[in-house]
Amino acid sequence: KCDLREHQLAGVNWLVQSYRRGLNVILADEMGLGKTVQTITYLGYLKFVCGVHGPSLVVAPLSVLSSWVAEFARWCPAMRVVRLHTADNKERELLRTEMLSDVRTFDVVLTTYEMAASASMQSIICGRMSWRYLVLDEGHRIKNERTIQYERLRHVRCQRKLLLTGTPLQNNMHELWAP
């Protein structure tokens, strides 16, 4: 059994209320306070309590992708998670085929910024798939709208967006507009 801390529960409640209002949101706090856990709990709540099924796309730096997999297994093991990250072209094609054959076989796709922005994945991530949720971990990575990552992720078809960051926002409206 896993228990949320008080501030994490408040964060999940805020995410749920924001969803009900139809808002895209930024969850920004200091590193290590549990944004990943809050997000996983929130996606689980949407599926198992509200009946809102995915698929959801979580884009994160490679350095934390394994942590996302482990945290899903710990906090919401009933969620079907696919890790979409490989340098092997045959494996990429297999993943692409599996994902396109039946989206009901998974709830969440975890991938990296580099994989999401790669030309070989654009047909899935931005073309054929329609995502329930797009979660961008370390979302400050897309604040520069002149990057390829920003340009490609901008075209992801999704109903809602959640940006996670441990990097403080500056007093700059442009930074809030870019994501």
Where are these regions (language model features)?
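ASCE P-loop NTPase motor core, strongest for the SF2 helicase catalytic module
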Residues: 1-179
